[in-house]
């Protein structure tokens, strides 16, 4: 029984009256209406093209913007279009199909009235139940136009008004967004069944470098530890510069009850990271001495470029001149004594002519060698009586050659030499350079598949020493990865991917530092450029992104943005990161811990993501 027949039945049952007291429609009127309906082809039926649509596009207004359309929908469909939903818009008249993303809304608007009209304000304030009917509205950004072969190209036109709009289901949404991969970040906000991942077996993301930014407490450590755990599982070599020692216990499962509950809700396991190794500088302590594999290491003076070394020390022009005079005299003395290159060794003879001091120091030169040369020159320039004190046996055994070489240095200004030697001696007293009680870093072992090396820098007060450690290890990693890459190519294999995480990157590469340390920055930039082709990726982690210079931001192609409250920082990042819509930028200051805006090269558009809880133990986390 249809609605008209039902109405007739009710009227007959009530003695010719409707229940609401309104008299019946005259029979001849109803008959005329029915005849008109039949003449028009029967009752209205929605066109098949509109079946299943959640809404339709609205006409444009003077306030419409390029690239976006307004979609209206009945109130029962509002819940079907959460934020970040992907939709398909079928422009019927011109037979075009578009893909779009919900960037604003959904909003509830009254039918036929302004939401701020006096009558609605009065009804709402007084709690009267006679609320008007309402509908939903969303703003959709056009992502692309779908061609007949399934390809998506940049849109050349706009969908026409009254075009039906369909919500993509989760599998199709994930396919359009490109969320597939073997390293999981979390789930898309509003789409708990869509996992947001990155492909570690492609050069699209990690070898093109990542920035993880956010204020304290935003969830950066959770993101970093979770990524390290997953990269280890798929055989990536990971090196993590840990400035606080908080990652030195990731070999154990998390003991945080809230993390355990969050992991259970996501269906994830509580587990530690396998194959972890903790390195700390000789003479320093680690935050986790109970770790099963703790190793001390030394710095080798010859591994550092003298140009990077003098920048890190912050030498003045006068001190810099004298530093290079001492280095040059020391090189000649090492050659004369056959320390390097060794006499009769043709390969070392050739290598000595090709040493690039912008990349590395002079082989086998130690800080102690430089102190002997510099001390003797200062002794002579200052007019000190007696013979200068010499510490190296090789120099003592040929004192005549040593004296002749240091006297060939034409120089003056004892004060500059004295300040320079004071700085070098302070470094020497730390006993971190060329210390025979500790081993050099074994980069070949460090870059084995699935190995996680945590360089604990927490027990270092000196930023200069910390930066020397990072600079030397970065350079060693680059050289080893170059060798691994060449060997893999010759064998027809893919090299082991390597990821290097640099915590508190603003201390290593701040705007002020790269202005005073251009050589050091150029080394990092060279690693970034070469690393893209050699499966070597850098991850810059910082809570103070305002201190990162534009030159560093320009090296990064993938971003995880946690809560950032400073509007000036957000404005600056907007100039460096493209494709993020306004609503995501405006949400950054209000993100909850664990939420992040993710802009990765494999994603078709940036997404708000609920980052997965960390399965492993972090120290110093409240």
Regions found by a protein language model. Name each.
Residues 241, 502, 541-542:
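Hydrophobic residues in beta-strands of the RecA-like P-loop NTPase core, especially within AAA+ ATPase
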Residues 28-177:
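Conserved ASCE P-loop ATPase motor domains encompassing nucleic-acid-directed helicases/translocases
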């Amino acid at each position: 029984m249809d609605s008209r027949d039902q109405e007739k039945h009710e009227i007959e049952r009530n003695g010719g009256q409707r229940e609401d007291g309104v008299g019946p429609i005259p029979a001849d009127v109803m008959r005329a209406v029915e005849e008109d309906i039949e003449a028009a082809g029967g009752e209205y039926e929605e066109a098949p093209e509109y079946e299943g649509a959640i809404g339709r596009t609205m006409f444009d207004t003077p306030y419409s913007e390029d690239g976006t359309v307004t979609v209206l929908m009945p109130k029962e469909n509002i819940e079907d279009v959460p934020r970040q939903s992907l939709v398909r818009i079928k422009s019927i008249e011109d037979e075009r199909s578009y893909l779009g993303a919900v960037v604003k809304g959904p909003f509830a608007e009254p039918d036929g009235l302004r939401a701020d009209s006096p009558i609605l304000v009065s009804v709402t304030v007084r709690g009267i139940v006679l609320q008007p009917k309402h509908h939903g509205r969303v703003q959709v950004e056009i992502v692309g136009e779908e061609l007949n072969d399934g390809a998506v190209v940049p849109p050349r036109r706009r969908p026409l008004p009254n075009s039906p709009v369909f919500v993509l289901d989760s599998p199709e949404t994930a396919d359009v967004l490109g969320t597939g991969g073997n390293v999981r970040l979390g789930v898309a906000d509003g789409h708990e069944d869509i996992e947001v991942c990155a492909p570690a077996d492609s050069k699209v993301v990690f070898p093109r470098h990542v920035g993880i930014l956010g204020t304290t407490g935003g969830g950066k450590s959770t993101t970093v530890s979770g990524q390290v755990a997953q990269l280890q599982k798929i055989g990536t070599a990971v090196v993590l510069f840990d400035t606080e020692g908080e990652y030195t216990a990731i070999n154990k499962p998390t003991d945080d009850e809230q993390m355990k509950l969050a992991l259970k809700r996501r269906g994830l396991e509580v587990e530690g990271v396998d194959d972890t190794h903790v390195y700390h500088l000789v003479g320093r302590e680690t935050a986790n001495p109970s770790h099963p594999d703790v190793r001390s290491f030394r710095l080798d003076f010859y591994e550092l470029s003298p140009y990077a070394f003098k920048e890190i020390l912050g030498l003045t022009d006068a001190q810099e001149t004298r530093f290079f005079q001492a280095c040059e005299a020391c090189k000649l003395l090492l050659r004369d004594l056959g320390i390097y290159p060794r006499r009769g060794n043709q390969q070392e003879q050739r290598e000595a002519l090709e040493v690039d001091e912008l990349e590395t120091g002079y082989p086998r030169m130690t800080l102690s060698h430089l102190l002997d040369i510099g001390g003797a020159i200062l002794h002579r320039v200052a007019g000190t009586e007696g013979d200068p004190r010499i510490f190296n046996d090789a120099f003592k055994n040929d004192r005549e050659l040593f004296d002749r070489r240091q006297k060939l240095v034409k120089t003056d200004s004892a004060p500059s030499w004295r300040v320079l030697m004071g700085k070098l001696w302070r470094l020497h007293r730390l006993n971190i350079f060329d210390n025979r009680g500790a081993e050099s870093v074994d980069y070949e072992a460090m870059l084995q598949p699935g190995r996680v090396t945590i360089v604990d820098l927490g027990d270092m007060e000196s930023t200069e020493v910390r930066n020397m450690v990072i600079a030397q290890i970065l350079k060693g990693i680059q050289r080893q990865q170059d060798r691994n890459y060449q060997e893999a190519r010759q064998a027809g294999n893919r090299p082991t991917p390597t990821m290097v995480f640099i915590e508190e990157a603003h201390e290593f590469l701040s705007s002020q530092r790269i202005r005073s340390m251009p050589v050091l920055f150029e080394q990092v930039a060279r690693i970034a450029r070469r690393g893209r082709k050699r499966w070597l990726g850098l991850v810059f982690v910082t809570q103070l992104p305002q201190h990162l210079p534009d030159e560093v931001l320009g090296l990064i192609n993938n971003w995880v943005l946690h809560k950032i409250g400073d509007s000036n920082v957000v404005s600056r990042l907007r100039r460096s990161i493209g494709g993020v819509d306004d609503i995501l930028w405006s949400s950054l200051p209000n993100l909850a811990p664990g939420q992040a805006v993710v802009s990765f090269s494999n994603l078709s558009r940036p997404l708000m993501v609920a980052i997965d809880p960390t399965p492993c133990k972090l120290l110093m986390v409240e």
